[in-house]
Amino acid sequence: MVSTHAVVAGETLSALALRFYGDAELYRLIAAASGIADPDVVNVGQRLIMPDFTRYTVVAGDTLSALALRFYGDAELNWLIAAASGIADPDVVNVGQRLIMPDFTRYTVVAGDTLSALAARFYGDASLYPLIAAVNGIADPGVIDVGQVLVIFIGRSDGFGLRIVDRNENDPRLWYYRFQTSAIGWNPGVNVLLPDDYRTSGRTYPVLYLFHGGGTDQDFRTFDFLGIRDLTAGKPIIIVMPDGGHAGWYSNPVSSFVGPRNWETFHIAQLLPWIEANFRTYAEYDGRAVAGFSMGGFGALKYAAKYYGHFASASSHSGPASLRRDFGLVVHWANLSSAVLDLGGGTVYGAPLWDQARVSADNPVERIDSYRNKRIFLVAGTSPDPANWFDSVNETQVLAGQREFRERLSNAGIPHESHEVPGGHVFRPDMFRLDLDGIVARLRPASIGAAAERAD
């Protein structure tokens, strides 16, 4: 949700811009978002909007109208770029000039809307409705028309135990955040991949939480390296790709000797509500899916069962689904890998004695009833490389565990989609495309207006 501020004695817009953005020149952005005609005059108690923004460098051929059309879908919003950037004549920009592109959504009024209700929804305070009226040139805040398009400023802010310590929202689709959180002893990163039309559509979207696998080369950037932008082009869904540790196993571990590594808390109790408070997503069962590769595929199945009301679809791409088979091979691997890579000798499930209740709570084959009324999608390889012990052991175990899981689902009368395909322990883009189509079909479709239950 966008940040707001109430002016106190002695404050100026320049001083506030320096405090909030680290740049006093951004006072114009605050003025534009808050409907202030004279930036030199603010009053004690006056409420201000502190929106997010993107810096843009003008290239040959650019005009403010063309940039407004590209960023916002409406050329006539060039005046907002001009106001935020301190440009007196919107028809004149120079190559190399740095522009401030305010971050806002275009909201289409539906029956029953009021400015005070929209202020409560977007700004967290119904009394801020005059700011929406001022920016949109509405003389009578008590009168708005169905179909009227409003400019409403947005932004990402701290909350739910997360403090933003780094961010980059300059890419048209892929936005990056890094958080400080007491759940993790270091600052985990998250990539959020937006639909092509997120900036301009005003729609609310379903969301997919996509989890990476284990290993020292795996983190929140993994799927970007694997081509996730192309794989999701044109799809009306938000993709959230968080850090999960090199061997975090999407769990709060039994023990850690390097500080907190509570990935389950970070993902479920902190990141999920933060996403829903800061992006236009559906905060409901039918608005969320979870998927992952390898360790992340296990995490997807685990979260879908353990947090039954959170996710309507769960997908495991070469992820283990049975923890206890073959004398608990997956549990032993989770304990060993987490001890070496993440926990300084601590373990996810306990060693030498396991926390048996925790294993059962996390074990997909022991949680079969928790997959009812969900879309389940499974992928496993049938021909791992025999010369590569890691590939062979991994995918052989994955295949056997998924077969056990599928049999139990079938015996319980729970529908599921499964694919056994040639190859070993690798991410398969063609299977992800197929999966994504099914996810989009299962979840609540993107929509505008009253259907949007949560927004920026």
UniProtKB/Swiss-Prot annotation:
Compartments, record wording: Secreted, Cell wall
Induction entry: Expression is up-regulated under nutrient depletion condition.
Reactions it catalyzes: a fatty acid ester + H2O = an aliphatic alcohol + a fatty acid + H(+); an octanoate ester + H2O = an aliphatic alcohol + octanoate + H(+); decanoate ester + H2O = decanoate + an aliphatic alcohol + H(+); a dodecanoate ester + H2O = an aliphatic alcohol + dodecanoate + H(+)
Keyword rRNA processing belongs to the record: no
InterPro entries from the UniProt entry: AB_hydrolase_fold, Esterase-like, LysM_dom, LysM_dom_sf, Mycobacterial_A85_antigen
Alphabetic keyword roster: Cell wall, Hydrolase, Lipid metabolism, Repeat, Secreted, Serine esterase
Active site (UniProt): 294, 391, 425
Matches recorded under PROSITE patterns: LYSM
Chain ranges of the LysM domain: 3-50, 54-101, 105-152
Keyword Repeat attributed: yes
Temperature dependence: Optimum temperature is 45 degrees Celsius.
Recorded GO MF terms: acetylesterase activity; acyltransferase activity, transferring groups other than amino-acyl groups
A Pfam family recorded for this sequence: LysM
Enzyme Commission number(s) of this protein: 3.1.1.-
pH-linked activity: Optimum pH is 9.0.
One GO term describing the cellular component: extracellular region
Biological process (GO), any one: lipid metabolic process
Result, substituting residue 391 to A: 85% reduction of activity
More info: Overexpression in M.smegmatis leads to change in colony morphology, enhanced pellicle and aggregate formation, which may be linked with the changed lipid composition of the cell wall. Cell wall has higher amount of lipids, with a significant increase in trehalose dimycolate content. Overexpression also leads to increased drug resistance and enhanced intracellular survival inside the macrophage cell line.
Record family assignment: Belongs to the AB hydrolase superfamily.
Record text about domains: Contains an N-terminal LytE region, which consists of three consecutive LysM domains, and a C-terminal esterase domain. LytM domains are essential for anchoring protein to the cell wall. The presence of LytM domains results in enhanced rate of protein aggregation at higher temperature.
Name of the protein this chain belongs to: Esterase Rv1288
Organism of origin: Mycobacterium tuberculosis (strain ATCC 25618 / H37Rv)
